[in-house]
Amino acid sequence: MSKISTKLKALTAVLSVTTLVAGCSTLPQNTDPQVLRSFSGSQSTQEIAGPTPNQDPDLLIRGFFSAGAYPTQQYEAAKAYLTEGTRSTWNPAASTRILDRIDLNTLPGSTNAERTIAIRGTQVGTLLSGGVYQPENAEFEAEITMRREDGEWRIDALPDGILLERNDLRNHYTPHDVYFFDPSGQVLVGDRRWLFNESQSMSTVLMALLVNGPSPAISPGVVNQLSTDASFVGFNDGEYQFTGLGNLDDDARLRFAAQAVWTLAHADVAGPYTLVADGAPLLSEFPTLTTDDLAEYNPEAYTNTVSTLFALQDGSLSRVSSGNVSPLQGIWSGGDIDSAAISSSANVVAAVRHENNEAVLTVGSMEGVTSDALRSETITRPTFEYASSGLWAVVDGETPVRVARSATTGELVQTEAEIVLPRDVTGPISEFQLSRTGVRAAMIIEGKVYVGVVTRPGPGERRVTNITEVAPSLGEAALSINWRPDGILLVGTSIPETPLWRVEQDGSAISSMPSGNLSAPVVAVASSATTVYVTDSHAMLQLPTADNDIWREVPGLLGTRAAPVVAY
């Protein structure tokens, strides 16, 4: 280990949290630690073609929409399609709407000198300040009036703001993660931002966004340790220069260094990185840093964590390895389990069992030493927090409950978590799963998929807020969900042609997964870093995630309809 890594490990010791407790109870202890500015892209070097001579009105409008993907010089490329008077009044910064596609229709009453064209499409998202994608699902309609100016068609009246087809967003913008710590200070959480591809200084854009703080959607679930006086000065003489960081102690400086280094590294900005705060090195003993120096905070480290496959079959749990199926001991082979989650690193099993017409959440070791944590009419499949520091389940379709072990008594403690649903969302929660960082929560309500943010209003308290529908195109077909280690959400559905889908965590994209030999419905889904597992109408199947489109039965479980459980 390098001298720098050794020193950094010493600095990070106060941030570490032990996740296992002694004794027969295996659930970890309950421990609670406790302005976005407007965004504009940097200049581009690419020359953008403007209107062509004698261009037809519909083609000119298409060219205008394509030019709207270039934010440089206050959208000068798009303004070239406007009449002289409209250029000074149109406000492109009012909004950026993302449409699945843009349809054009000329309205009656058009003449050789003036035309009005209707614009229609489904708005699938909005690109907010700072490159934040907000999913939407609404029909969009507007009108554009065109007039001849010096013999050429130009746009004379139009709504403020930019309209982009989704393909133009993907072609000209790339999502990057800006990293912030969860409230425990243990794990970096990505805050996804869509940034213009042709920026000359992507690194400076990212550092400015980092100092500006987390986006409103995720802000309640992460920590922003910088004061409002903090600012990013720029990249000068090979240094990333910041001011207003004088209030940060050594631990806070280390955390900010981790945020900056991993934000840059995951955007393919090469290191080493020199971070300067108020004229001096951010970390006094380490003027330059690499990702190796801050490997403890690698936000993708858990994507390569070794996982273990288990199967839930006929109400009993078994370990599956190299074609061998080994039943677990005791209560875990009792034949009454409906769903389960397992943490192999913490040796914790959480299972929902049926007993005397009740659902019972039982928690214990794999060896079978257990405690009953909850009883209710219904309990959803349990889900673990980051590092297995607690687990969650939803009782009776409406109340999330967090279960953790008391640090003082050693007993299981149940805490109801408030959930703030959008006003128009009603119905029971049938699935509820935490992301690997524990900061995001995905849920299914009446067959629709939603993602929210887990916040900590006070010691021991939890709240799920900022809940947004992320896959409206699936309608009400969702049946099962699972977070991949890389933050992609997998959704099993009842759609016959495409029963399995992947959804980006910000809702910016949804795509079907290979379905050649899958048979809907997909009632269970789980994933490791390398393999996706599902239960369809016939069997438990697996699909390697690397360039493969053939689902195969799991060795040892041929011809059986088991549910996959992947443990970390």
UniProtKB/Swiss-Prot annotation:
Name listed for the protein in its UniProt record: Lipoprotein LpqB
Annotated lipid attachment (N-palmitoyl cysteine): C24
UniProt cross-references to PROSITE patterns, sorted A to Z: PROKAR_LIPOPROTEIN
Subcellular location as annotated: Cell membrane
Signal sequence coordinates: 1-23
Membrane topology, from the record: Lipid-anchor
Lipid modification (S-diacylglycerol cysteine), residues: C24
Keyword Cell membrane among record annotations: yes
Keywords for this protein: Cell membrane, Lipoprotein, Membrane, Palmitate, Signal
Keyword Signal in annotation: yes
GO cellular component terms listed in the entry, alphabetical order: plasma membrane
Family: Belongs to the LpqB lipoprotein family.
Stored InterPro entries: GerMN (IPR019606), Lipoprotein_LpqB (IPR023959), Lipoprotein_LpqB_C (IPR018910)
